[in-house]
């Protein structure tokens, strides 16, 4: 089932962020763009590489007015230790959200019940709390966060230019398309 153009459902979770335990709710996502990046579990193999990639691009997300949230089915306590012990995860300046009850992973359709883990899911959410992009895939395939950033910027662009669309491989500053009858069959 697609979650595109649906509202994020109410939730409450604990996260490790900037050396503290903090609460994250659906209200935390409102008023700014948000990127939720679901991962299977702390202390695994691909997950730290993705967190490091997100950390390397974090300034760009912030410049775009977006916050990044990493979500696993672990507790916020595990995230604290993971942040303190993994050189890659230690670079994270964004919230590491715990979902031990699987409420978030179920709400976003990425829970693997038989494993108690999450699939690799990425969701871009607009400031009103509406899901604008989603991508879910096998846990053996890590994501390229630069592509997530590109999708965020495309979602932001079409939100502020509703009569235009971003074509394949579109990057910020490049030409978009204005759908019209005159374009039909000409692309």
Task: Enumerate the predicted regions with their spans.
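Chalcogenol-based redox active-site neighborhoods
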Residues: 1-187
